Amino acid sequence: MQRSSACMGISVPTRAQTDLPKQRSSACMGISVPARAQSDLPKQKSSACMGISVPARAQSDLPKQRKQRLYGNKCPGPSAAQLPGADRQRLYEKKWPGRSAVQPAG
């Protein structure tokens, strides 16, 4: 019963995560798994080829992290070429006068 309800986005306790079959754990994106329980999942073996272990909800960041892990600083992605905060702020205000990239607090 618990396995069938796991596909509906219900958080399952860590001890129940470990006995999920590999196909089911990779097919159910609705399960929220804490990072420390991720290492217990059978799915971890299939994603180990990427060299990154992330919680399921952080999957969208994978390509960026993978590039950084594989190439380091040799081939920086577009995000590495961004300007520091103050210069970026000045550029933003030059493009859109009247707007500010930094919102005032409150």
Curated annotation (Swiss-Prot):
Q: Where is the composition biased (Basic and acidic residues)?
A: 87-96
Give the signal peptide, or none.
Answer: 1-18
According to the UniProt record, where is the region Disordered?
Answer: 1-25, 55-106
Which keywords label this protein?
A: Signal
User: Would you tell me the protein name for this molecule?
Assistant: Protein B9
